[in-house]
Amino acid sequence: MNAIIIEDNTIDLLNLESLLSKYFPEIVILGHATSVKSGIELLSTTKPDLVISDVQLPDGVSFDILNQLDSFPFQLIVISAFDSYAMNAIKIGAIDYILKPATRVTLENAINKAKVQVDQKIRMEQ
């Protein structure tokens, strides 16, 4: 499964990358972005199965990225230090919402949900 991370906080980004490489070696990180603008650019040049995104970014919120896309053919995991964005994340189609800091258990639960959806999509395309 290919993934991108959209996170502006270096510590949180390093934590996510560490958890993914240690516990989810099957996930290939295609790149990371630190803003709405760079997130849109990264999505235009990659085809991720999974996007893990912080909500609050320097130039907006992650939902701004999704609003600028015609569709999003990837699974979305939203991460935030605030629970107030959870309903928006679910309404927009996120597979899960994780409160920071992400842990192995919370990330594993979210990734397992995403894997089910990605596998289902692959089977339907065959």
Task: State where each predicted segment sits.
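Non-catalytic signal-transmission and effector/linker regions of two-component phosphorelay proteins
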Residues: M1-N2
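Generic detector of well-ordered alpha-helical packing
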Residues: D8-N9, V55
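Two-component/phosphorelay signaling modules centered on CheY-like receiver
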Residues: N9-T34
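Acidic, metal-coordinating helix/loop segments flanking the phosphotransfer/catalytic sites
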Residues: E17, H32-L50
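Structural motif
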Residues: K22-P25, L43, Q68-L69
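CheY-like receiver
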Residues: E41, D49-E125
